[in-house]
């Protein structure tokens, strides 16, 4: 297939998991949310799925996709902004685990691997999505890559959570492009990093002025379910506890 052509999108349904392939990319969805033991249904049920807020000012788990771009060794090695590389890696792993638990589609992409310019996604992050394909690009702007764009559109989501390295390049470019197309975008400030604090901060300012919503990994994750008595909270809680313990190790 010509590298500029986009392969047809096809869906494969497997027991309790759904994989949606879009060209070279794979969108990963976790098993369906299980109702907690002892939970009941109907009026007065102690556990329920988290509904959208009336104003829809806060984001819900069922209306978002997670896009992760260029979490590669060369980029990690050059992070010089406020959130250090170890925490960027941990926060990204945390976001993936939350996404899998809440059935949020994930699009994972790299730049320059097939060209021999960069190495693949770091194992700690790739290992959170076993068996998934990764969309490799030549463009620093993922939004200009037809396979990446097809994968994003295949999610059917209009609210995007985006993380990338570096903040000022491979995050900023697709963020401002997505905003210009009418998507809502949340940038995860502590799951990204720049070549300097100045570059990182300037890029955050640019994206916010363009309409992006700045957030952090834990705050954004809890926003997606909000109610500790929701079914979503029962699967998210162990992940949050794991994250807080891991955070202590690198603090």
Predicted regions span which residues?
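Active-site acidic carboxylates
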Residues: 36-138, 154, 187, 201-208, ...
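Residue-level signal for short, function-critical loop segments
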Residues: 110-112, 166, 191
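N-terminal secretory signal peptides
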Residues: 1-14, 22-31
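Internal catalytic-core helix/loop-beta-alpha segment
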Residues: 137-176, 180
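Conserved, surface-exposed functional patches that form binding/active-site neighborhoods
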Residues: 173-183, 198-205
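A short glycine-rich beta-strand->turn/loop micro-motif centered on a GG-aromatic cluster
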Residues: 161-164, 183-197
């Amino acid at each position: 297939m010509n590298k500029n052509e986009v392969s047809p999108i096809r869906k494969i349904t497997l027991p309790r998991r759904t994989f949606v392939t879009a060209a070279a990319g794979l969108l990963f969805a976790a098993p369906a949310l299980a109702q907690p033991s002892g939970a009941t249904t109907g009026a007065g049920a102690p556990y329920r799925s988290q509904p959208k807020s009336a104003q829809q000012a806060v984001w819900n788990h069922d209306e978002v996709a997670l896009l992760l771009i260029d979490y590669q060794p060369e980029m990690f090695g050059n992070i010089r902004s406020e959130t250090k590389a170890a925490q960027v890696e941990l926060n990204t792993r945390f976001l993936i685990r939350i996404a899998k638990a809440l059935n949020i589609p994930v699009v994972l992409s790299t730049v320059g691997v097939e060209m021999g310019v960069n190495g693949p996604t770091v194992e700690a992050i790739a290992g959170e999505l076993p068996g998934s394909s990764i969309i490799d690009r030549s463009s620093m702007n993922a939004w200009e890559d037809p396979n990446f764009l097809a994968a994003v559109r295949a999610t059917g989501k209009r609210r995007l959570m985006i993380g990338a390295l570096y903040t000022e390049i491979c995050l900023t470019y697709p963020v401002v492009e997505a905003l210009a197309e009418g998507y809502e975008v949340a940038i995860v400030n502590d799951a990204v990093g720049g070549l300097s604090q100045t570059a990182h901060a300037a890029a955050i300012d640019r994206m916010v002025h363009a309409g992006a919503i700045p957030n952090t990994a834990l705050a954004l994750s809890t926003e997606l379910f909000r109610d500790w008595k929701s079914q979503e909270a029962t699967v998210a809680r162990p992940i949050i506890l794991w994250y807080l313990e891991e955070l202590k190790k690198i603090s």
